[in-house]
Amino acid sequence: VQSEHQQSQPKLMFFGDPHGDLKPVVAAVQHLRPEAIVLLGDIQARQPLHIKLSSILDLTEVWFIHGNHDTDTVEDFDNLFGSKIADRNLHGRIVEIAGYKVAGLGGIFRTKIWDPRRPIEEAAFLSSDAMRRAMKREERWRDGISRKHRSSIFPDDYQKLLRGGAADILVTHEAPAAHSHGWQAIDELAETLGVQLVVHGHHHQDIDYVAEGLMTAAAPFRAFGVDMGSHLAWPRGAADGSESEGIPQDLLDLAAQAFGEAAQAWLNRPHELLDGRTPTAFAAKGDSEKVRRMLSAIQHGGVV
């Protein structure tokens, strides 16, 4: 999903779940100098986020949404929500960033709170405030709802975004419906906001939904998942979103020799030898040698 090959200075970069390792974020920002970045949740910084990212705060604007693991421990919670850049949380609002209106929905759907496949009236609690009021004082955490449910999506969070007006980009921790563990509610939110792009984390996969055949080019928005330690740069270099962006020409030639007209389909199909990624995504990240060996083996009669 990375676009380093097409554009030296992207406007926006989206980073998949760091889970405490922010070195890839720092390195990419220092190399590519985007105008702004968005962390897609499960940050779990080992120190306050402004300290972990201190070397890049003068180089780019840092924004984030939270993930479900950002409420796992007191340390996870405080290092994010207690940091000096806690006001850069995009959850539940739309902010203009690097020339784009970016909407954010952090956290996950927990069906004990709200199953978005069911009517909102059936939610256990419509808002975190409603949940707090229903709790006994001794059940509260820091006089509010439990720490765990501070990363749960409540109907009120969702509806606030629905009423927020138009946006260009929607960033979420949860995936859209085309993902096997995705949610139609994400698609409905994206379409209501009129976004052109949805970017999510959570599932530790680099996914170009159109290139991998999960969505059609006629879909109302483009969608990408970003893996842990990976990133997506935006805008992409090629206006048509070609599936072959960033792949060395010799790999394209090898694929054509091995598969003929089916070459592109093979390049865009997830493969177990590539940790479930597509050869396209794997090669675009700079890991083209393994794909090259696979194609060579196929040409010589091997089964891959």
Question: Model-flagged regions — what are they?
Answer:
Residues V1-K23, A98, G106-F109, E121-S127, ...:
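Acidic, histidine-bearing metal-coordination/catalytic regions of metal-dependent phosphoesterases
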Residues H19-V25, Q44-L49, N68-D76, R110-W114, ...:
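Active-site environment of divalent metal-dependent phosphoester hydrolases
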Residues S242-V304:
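Non-transmembrane "mature" sequence context
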Residues V1-D58, D72, R163-A166:
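N-terminal active-site segment of His-dependent metallophosphoesterases
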